[in-house]
């Protein structure tokens, strides 16, 4: 019978399910579990699995907390080949007010993927209310 396992939320290693301290990195698993949900979502932006990051991006966009804008932009820049993730970040940032607009401007200038740069630039123009912001193009999803 296989031993029950869990994934450490700090180092993402597989560890025994009954552990309270990660044997790999020493993280206090009880303290990590008790963290605020926003803190957990921000930590998930560093997760090695793209679907975990994507869920965090979507949730952070829906929560609309401007203080998460830079962390979202950093996530997109850490994973430059994941264009779908980058576009999701652009959409999430569009819900974060001025902080989101600043992060969008950073992506528009610095993201390696042209599609993400273009989407960030278009979203920046739309948020400013620019009448020439290519109205025939749909905003990124």
Where are these regions (language model features)?
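Short inter-helical turns and helix N-cap capping residues of alpha-solenoid HEAT/ARM repeat scaffolds
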Residues: 48-49, 79-82, 112-115
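Residue-level detector of extended alpha-helical repeat arrays and alpha-solenoid scaffolds
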Residues: 53, 69, 82-86, 117
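Flanking scaffold residues of small Cys/His-coordinated metal-binding clusters
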Residues: 2-3, 17
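Amphipathic alpha-helical scaffolding segments comprising HEAT/armadillo-like alpha-solenoid repeats
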Residues: 3-7, 23, 32-44, 65-78, ...
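Cys/His-rich microdomains that often coordinate metals
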Residues: 15, 29
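Cys/His-coordinated zinc-binding microdomains
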Residues: 12, 26
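Residue-level signature of the C-terminal ends
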Residues: 28, 60-63, 93-99, 126-130
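Residue-level signature of alpha-solenoid helical repeat scaffolds
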Residues: 58, 74, 91, 106, ...
């Amino acid at each position: 019978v296989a031993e029950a396992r869990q994934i450490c939320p700090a180092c993402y290693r597989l560890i025994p399910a009954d552990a309270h301290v990660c044997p790999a990195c020493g993280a206090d698993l009880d303290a990590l579990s008790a963290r605020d949900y926003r803190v957990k979502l921000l930590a998930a932006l560093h997760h090695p699995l793209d679907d975990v990051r994507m869920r965090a991006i979507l949730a952070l966009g829906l929560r609309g907390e401007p203080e998460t804008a830079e962390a979202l932009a950093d996530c997109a820049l850490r994973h430059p080949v994941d264009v779908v993730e980058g576009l999701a970040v652009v959409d999430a940032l569009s819900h974060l007010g001025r902080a989101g607009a600043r992060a969008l401007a950073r992506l528009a200038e610095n993201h390696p993927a042209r599609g993400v740069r273009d989407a960030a630039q278009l979203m920046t123009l739309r948020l400013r209310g620019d009448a020439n912001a290519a109205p025939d193009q749909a905003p990124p999803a």
